[in-house]
Amino acid sequence: MEENKIFHLGLCLAGSVSAGSYTAGVLDYLLDALKIWEERKRQNLPDTPTQDVRISVIGGASGGGMTGIIASSILQNEIIPVKFPTSLKEILADQPQNKLYNAWVDMLGEDMFPMMLDTADIDKNKEITSLLNSDFIDKLANKLVKAKENKNRNFPGYIYSPLKVFLTLTNLAGFPYEISYRGNTTLNKYYMAVHNDYACFKLNTDEAEKDEWMPLDFATGKNVETARLAAMATGAFPIFLKSRVLARETREVNKIRWLKYVDPVQGNEYVTQNIDGGILNNEPFEIVRFVLNELTSQPDSTIYNDPDFFKSTILLIDPFPSEKPADFKIDTGFLKTLAYTINCLVGQGRAKPGILASSVNIDLAGQFMIA
C-alpha cells in the first residue's frame, strides 16, 4: 500500500488508576477487531471495507502508559482473546496467553491485598517508601515485559512500522531553564523548572535515531529494561506506590523536542526520580497529534479535522473522563484548604491552554473518545 493511502490511528491511553482493566479490555478488543478486518481483506470477502488503517503511535500516562508498553511487547506474537468467563474462579484464573488480561485482571493471584499490605518491603528497604508494598509492580513488570521474548520482528498489517510508543513522566527534579532579561547579571538570573518528562520509543528500528525516539526491540532486548522501568515510573501513584528511578542516555533526553526550551542535561547518563505521569499530563493527546501531523504532513487543524481530507485521527481511551466541576464551595478549614490546594496544583499542571478550543469541539474528525 502506498504511504499516502494509509490512514494513521493514534491511541491515547489516559491515566486509569485502578481501572487499567478497562483500558486493556478496550485495547484488546480493538486489536482483535483490526486482526479480523485484516483477515477479511486478505480473503477478499464481500462487504469488507478496503481502507488501510494502521496504529502508528501509542501514547499513555499512568495505567494507560503501562498498558501501552505491555501492548507494544505483544504485537509481534499471536494475541489470543480470553474466552468470556462464566464464574469468578474463571475470571481470576491465570491467562498467560493474553498479557493485557494477565496484567490487569488475574495479575499475580486471586487476592492482591495481602501482597500490597505486606511489610516485607520495609524490612528490605529499611525505610517506608510508600503506603502500599510496591513489589507486586516489579513482579508484574518482570513477568510481562521481557527481553528476547519475541522471535518474530514483523508487525501485523494493522500496525504501522516503525510504531512509536511514549509515556508521560512526572520528573521530581525537573528541567531548569533561564528566562533572560535585559540588564540581567550573572548573579541575578531568573530560573524556572518544568517537571513534564517523556520516555519515547520506536519499535524495531536499527537506524541511528536523530530525534527523541529510542530504539526498542523485544526480540534483541534493546532498551527493554528502560521501557520496563519507564512503565513502572509512569504508574507510580504518589504516596501509595513508591517513586521510581529511571536512567537514560543524556543524548536521548536532550533530543526530546517538547523540552527544547529547557537547559540541556549534562553527562553521559541522566538519572531521574519519577512519580505518576498522569499528575501533570494525564491525556497526552497533543503529543499523539504532533506525531500524526508529522506522518501525514497535515499540520493544519482545519485539514486534519475535516472529514473530507483527514488522514489520521486520535482515539482517546479514558476510563474516567473529566466532568464539569461542581460549584466551588468556600471552606477555609485546614483540611479542606489542603485538598483544594492539591486539586488546584494538579488541575493547573494538566491544563493545555493552547489546544482548549479544539478539544471541546465534538464535531472534529481528528479526535474520538471511548470512555
Regions found by a protein language model. Give the residues of each.
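Patatin-like phospholipase
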Residues: 1-371
